[in-house]
Amino acid sequence: MTTHDVLILGAGPAGLAAAVELKRLGIRDVVVLEREQHAGGVPRHCGHAGFGWKEFRRVLTGPSYAERMVHAAAGVDIRTGTTALALEADGRVKAVTPRGIETITGRRVLLALGTRETPRSARLVSGTRPWGVFTTGALQQLVYLARTTPCTRAVIVGTELVAFSSLLTMRHAGIKPVAMIEESDRIVAPRPGGWIARMAFGARVLERTRVVAIHGAGKVSGLEVERDGAREVIACDGIVFSGRFVPETAIVRPSHLEIDPATGGPVIDQYGRCSDPTYFAAGNLLRPVEASWTAWGEGR
């Protein structure tokens, strides 16, 4: 078992910002654990621009922003391919590392685990289980990291801002956005979001519309929706479930840390301390979802 001054779980904007600030303050024994093979968090998957202005005074694509964050944290011990399994008292963290299962201890531990979208299964959408159903994050990984085009015509379920990230990803990959589906009377993204989706991307925006079922054998062939009592099957070969973010609390909920029922993340005080004062939390783990610059600022 090894002990460090500070242990940070998550190498996204919040985790890397904290590492950079600790380095600036002269705290050298800082270790960052990241389950993916590369540091940078969700922005690595976002090939479009819109990142970095508040942090670096540059408008950057997601990968460029992630690269800048990692560069700023140069000299920090960032251990990729390492997954935290359990949080224990006194800053002990069990993790799967390239060497096997280890216990790594931090005199202080920062949880910067981020957030995730709600997938099809958690939304209780019926129908078949064909290939071609994604979250925005999965779509972006396939397009920007795997460099594949997973479908040609897609429907986006949800109209939060992240849905527009899906639209930009589709444009990059040459995927036709057929429609955007929203259950409420108006889309969630601020105006003129609906106009942009229709006019700039050519997508139908269907408000007051409920997803009924997914059709297809082997591969998606359509999405059945209901609007004003009438049902329609929208022909498509891809469905993207976007938004409805929830904190990434898979290892927090089974732990000894208290959970805030209002946010789903850990309870913190005004200093970001959890119910066990050895642990702190920052970023989108606390109340999804905020922009990357907010997570960066909280980490610092």
Where on the chain are the PLM-derived regions?
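Hydrophobic alpha-helical scaffolding
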Residues: 56-63, 237-242, 289-293
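FAD-site-proximal beta/loop scaffold in flavoenzymes
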Residues: 133-143, 238-289
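Internal hydrophobic alpha-helix adjacent to the cofactor/substrate pocket in enzyme cavities
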Residues: 293-300
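Short glycine/serine/threonine-rich phosphate/pyrophosphate-binding segments
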Residues: 15-18, 119, 136-139, 162-167, ...
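General beta-strand structural signal in soluble alpha/beta enzymes
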Residues: 32-35, 78-80, 104-105, 111-113, ...
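FAD-binding core/adjacent interface of flavoenzyme oxidoreductases
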Residues: 1-9, 65-153, 224-231, 240, ...
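Beta1-alpha1 glycine-rich phosphate/pyrophosphate-binding loop at the start
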Residues: 4-64, 68, 141, 151-194, ...
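A Rossmann-like FAD-binding core segment of flavoenzymes
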Residues: 70-73, 78-95, 171-253, 258
